[in-house]
Amino acid sequence: MPQQIELRNIALQAAQPLVHGVSLTLQRGRVLALVGGSGSGKSLTCAATLGILPAGVRQTAGEILADGKPVSPCALRGIKIATIMQNPRSAFNPLHTMHTHARETCLALGKPADDATLTAAIEAVGLENAARVLKLYPFEMSGGMLQRMMIAMAVLCESPFIIADEPTTDLDVVAQARILDLLESIMQKQAPGMLLVTHDMGVVARLADDVAVMSHGKIVEQGDVETLFNVPKHAVTRSLVSAHLALYGMELAS
């Protein structure tokens, strides 16, 4: 399994350019946070990595490499990169139970799909009464439960990399804390490389090792999390950090 995945000079376009020459490097055991405002190109960059660009959007330049060798995004999806989506409800077929979803995911990846394996994954993400959860349909579960089920699927994949696209969006504070605890636990136990897409600098401060800031489809600043919080250089980065500090009655040093 690869130890590093690199996005090199990725450019995306629809009727007009959307993402301009984005380069990122994911490494096993490290969390890279991709931050920026809505519409900055974060989710499109993830979609390009997985080969699931929306209709009408195409990649016009750049490549993806695994351990320095060019690779197709389709060869990465699921096997080498597990995904925790922004809207978990849209990720599940409403006609299938959680047991069917989990079992089919395992079978598609050639992983063990016995009930003991599925139960262990569900218990690992803190969902009580795994036997009952496996019988549930998506519409019978809360957003927080579905997000934890998405994380359970990522655990089942045993992929060396994870893309978590706004994993705490639209969740209440308690559910957000649980999701962050789970992501932190996965990093400690499995040490995957993680691309964490978020607009929440509090999430960045807690989980990230490195940060890349996007604005208008471009990476405007990259660095380790400590440097970026203490000495942000770009105006967009300074704005994000200042807004985060203001929540605690603090100001960014001038």
Curated annotation (Swiss-Prot):
Transmembrane segments: none
InterPro entries listed in its UniProt record: AAA+_ATPase, ABC_Ni/Peptide_Import, ABC_transporter-like_ATP-bd, ABC_transporter-like_CS, Nickel_NikD, P-loop_NTPase
Gene Ontology CC annotation, any one: plasma membrane
Annotated ATP binding sites: G36, G37, S38, G39, S40, G41, K42, S43
MF (Gene Ontology): ABC-type nickel transporter activity; ATP binding; ATP hydrolysis activity; nickel cation binding
Subcellular compartments: Cell inner membrane
SUPFAM superfamilies: P-loop containing nucleoside triphosphate hydrolases
Main location: membrane
Catalytic activity: Ni(2+)(out) + ATP + H2O = Ni(2+)(in) + ADP + phosphate + H(+)
Alphabetic keyword roster: ATP-binding, Cell inner membrane, Cell membrane, Ion transport, Membrane, Nickel, Nickel transport, Nucleotide-binding, Translocase, Transport
EC number: 7.2.2.11
Gene3D superfamilies xrefs: P-loop containing nucleotide triphosphate hydrolases (3.40.50.300)
Domain ABC transporter: 2-241
Membrane topology per record: Peripheral membrane protein
EC class: translocase
One Pfam family matching this protein: ABC_tran
Complex and partners: The complex is composed of two ATP-binding proteins (NikD and NikE), two transmembrane proteins (NikB and NikC) and a solute-binding protein (NikA).
NCBIfam families for the chain: nickel_nikD (TIGR02770)
Family: Belongs to the ABC transporter superfamily. Nickel importer (TC 3.A.1.5.3) family.
Task performed by this protein: Part of the ABC transporter complex NikABCDE involved in nickel import. Responsible for energy coupling to the transport system.
Protein name: Nickel import ATP-binding protein NikD
Protein species of origin: Escherichia coli O6:H1 (strain CFT073 / ATCC 700928 / UPEC)
Gene: nikD
